[in-house]
Swiss-Prot record:
The gene is tolB. The lineage of its organism: Bacteria, Pseudomonadati, Pseudomonadota, Alphaproteobacteria, Hyphomicrobiales. This is Tol-Pal system protein TolB. GO terms for biological process: cell division; protein import. It comes from Rhizobium etli (strain CIAT 652). InterPro entries: 6-blade_b-propeller_TolB-like (IPR011042), PD40 (IPR011659), Tol-Pal_TolB (IPR014167), TolB_N (IPR007195). HAMAP family: TolB.
Length: 436
């Protein structure tokens, strides 16, 4: 097991840069209403941050984050008229209005005497002729990518009014080798596919990793010693432990929103039912009791309800129940079968995998089953996971043929599907909350 201390590797100081940097009220400046669904990407000019290669790299990551969201269209630098030489000074707004830059980002990256990096940025509205916001951050040089993600989040929030999702991690199953000799390891990475680190050595099959709300633990299923069990992995130390030594197979684990429980499936006598385990007392509570396969439980963000998959009606469908197991109600009624339900962090939607007509789709529906929408369909799409702002999903796709699965992201419009490049094949992604 490998140690992973990277969650505490960054030390960021955040603050307004000076009195001149205080943001003007947002209602006087450019905004982007993303509640309307599919929106036209906003043209935004992101200049190379001053002071060498590091500054240019930071601005490139910011631009890539914003472009991948589908809400922003970074303007090609060849169109820039003004060359920013002093990010503290007001830009020539007319030069940016000519190229229709609805927003402008300037900044610099410098190295302090103690070796730390200082990254600062300013966000401008050229058409209002005003600065919108500005911040500065301090960190160790190796964490420059994370600072870029934090800045991208700040820009996203200032313009959309909602939290971003760029300063996050994704835990997933990294797959390598042939189908006959496939090696599967738990891995973790930045949400854009960079900084991949292996968490297990690949000696045991691993499936369905899930983040804890505190970002410090992962629960997953492993076939260690040929015994399929649910485990807890401490990301800081690499220490792992079994979640309950049950006589049958345990699988499909997920944390409760408060991190105090793990909800999972337990297979006994040919049936699979859903249980919770209190992580402090280690007491278990049975929530379902059917002669069927009940699996893939997922809490609502307030912890009051649970969505899950069950074939009690003949084929897999999505059900919702209260957190104590009462009020079990089927909510999926379309053609085909439904699986892997997962509740949005916003509480308004449940994402799912749907199999119909020989193809697999990723879709969303409201918690009462209404408003079903398919976002993408292919040979085999599966395992949706939500970004912490509830605006984007990640999933894995297996194409027909001899290759392996790959990770993709897509927003709720279904029009912004993006490949998330990883060093090897990837499956079973799970998005972290925003980092701190």
């Amino acid at each position: 097991m490998m140690k992973c201390s990277f969650f505490r590797a960054i030390l960021v100081a955040v603050g307004l840069m000076a009195a001149a940097v205080v943001a003007t009220p947002a209602n006087a400046l450019v905004t982007l209403d993303i509640r309307k669904g599919n929106v036209q990407p906003m043209p935004i000019a992101i200049t190379d941050f001053l002071q060498g290669d590091m500054g240019a790299q930071v601005s490139q990551v910011i631009a890539a984050d914003l472009q991948r969201s589908g809400l922003f269209a970074p303007i090609n630098k060849s169109a820039f008229i003004e060359k920013i030489s002093n990010p503290d000074a007001s830009p020539r707004f007319e030069d940016w209005k000519v190229i229709n830059a609805q927003a402008l980002v300037t900044g610099r990256v410098t190295q302090e005497a103690d070796g730390r990096l200082r990254a600062e940025f300013r966000l401008w509205d050229p058409f209002a002729g005003q600065q919108m916001t500005g911040q500065q951050f301090y960190t160790q040089p190796e964490n420059w990518r994370r600072v870029a993600h934090i800045i991208a989040d700040a820009i996203y929030k200032q313009i959309t009014g909602e939290e971003g999702y760029f300063d996050t991690r994704v835990v997933f199953v990294s797959e390598s080798g042939t189908k006959q000799q496939r090696k599967r390891q738990l891995a973790i990475m930045d949400q854009d596919g960079f900084n991949v680190r292996m968490l297990t050595d690949g000696s045991d099959l691993v499936l369905t990793p899930r983040f804890s709300p505190n970002r410090q633990e992962v629960t997953y299923m492993s076939f260690a010693n040929q015994q399929p069990r649910v485990y807890l992995l401490q990301l800081e130390t690499g220490q792992r432990e079994v979640v309950g030594n049950f006589p049958g197979m345990t699988f499909s684990p997920r944390f409760s929103p408060d991190g105090q429980k793990v909800i999972m499936s337990l297979q006994q006598e040919g049936n699979s039912n859903i249980y919770t385990m209190d992580l402090r007392s280690r007491t278990t509570t049975r929530l379902t009791s059917t002669a069927a396969i009940d699996t893939s439980p997922s809490y609502s963000p307030d912890g009051a309800r649970v969505s899950f998959e069950s074939d009690r009606g003949g084929k897999p469908q999505i059900y919702v129940m209260n957190a104590d197991g009462s009020g079990q109600t089927r909510i999926s009624f379309g053609d085909g079968s439904y699986s892997t339900p997962v509740w949005s962090p916003r509480g308004d939607l449940i994402a799912f995998t749907k199999q119909a007509g020989g193809k697999f789709s990723i879709g969303v529906m409201k918690p009462d089953g209404s408003g079903e929408r398919i976002l993408t369909t292919g040979f085999h799409n599966e395992g949706p996971t939500w970004a912490p702002n509830g605006r984007v999903l990640m999933f894995f796709r297996q194409a027909a043929g001899a290759g392996g699965p790959q990770l993709y992201s897509i927003d709720l419009t279904g029009y912004n599907e993006q490949l998330v490049k990883t060093p090897s094949y990837g499956s079973d992604p799970a998005w972290s909350p925003l980092l701190e």
